[in-house]
């Protein structure tokens, strides 16, 4: 698929599909250039927000909370209703002692969102159970 993307670099949904495949396999070094390309070159707000959210999560996984939140906040600035960005933000904030209450508020508000998948709801509820007790 890399060859196809190389020949068609601006087909953003295809690039996102490949980046997400890498992301889900925790191959962040392969996912990052594709998400960065979309974040920098796409005019599609949803794809740009998704890319920024995924970049933010990868940065968080590398241990840089502040930079990760910068990416996620930018994703929310351009797409305020992004469930992915909001979920990542809540998960990151709940794990930090000084922002735990804000994280709990975010994740509790997401619980009631009918657009949230059952799988994501289950993850959020597990996280809340850990930090609310």
Enumerate the predicted regions with their spans.
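Residue-level detector of the short coil/turn that links helix A to helix B
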Residues: 26, 63, 97-98
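Canonical tetratricopeptide repeat
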Residues: 17, 51-54, 88, 123-127
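Residue-level recognition of tetratricopeptide repeat
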Residues: 11, 82, 116-117
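Conserved structural position within tetratricopeptide repeats
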Residues: 2-6, 40-43, 73-77, 112
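Terminal, low-structured helical/coil segments at or just beyond the last alpha-helical repeat
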Residues: 98-133
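Single-residue signature of alpha-solenoid repeat helices
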Residues: 31, 68, 102-103
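TPR alpha-solenoid repeat register
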Residues: 14, 48-51, 85, 120
């Amino acid at each position: 698929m890399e060859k196809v993307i190389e020949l068609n670099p601006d087909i953003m949904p295809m690039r996102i599909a490949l980046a997400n495949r890498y992301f889900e396999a925790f191959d962040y070094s392969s996912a990052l250039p594709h998400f960065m390309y979309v974040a920098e070159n796409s005019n599609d707000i949803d794809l740009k927000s998704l890319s920024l959210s995924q970049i933010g999560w990868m940065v968080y996984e590398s241990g840089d909370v502040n930079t990760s939140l910068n990416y996620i906040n930018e994703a929310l600035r351009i797409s305020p209703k992004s469930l992915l960005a909001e979920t990542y933000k809540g998960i990151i904030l709940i794990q930090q002692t000084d922002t735990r209450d804000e994280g709990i508020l975010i994740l509790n508000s997401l619980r009631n969102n009918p657009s949230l998948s059952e799988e994501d709801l289950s993850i959020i509820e597990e996280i809340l159970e850990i930090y609310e007790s």
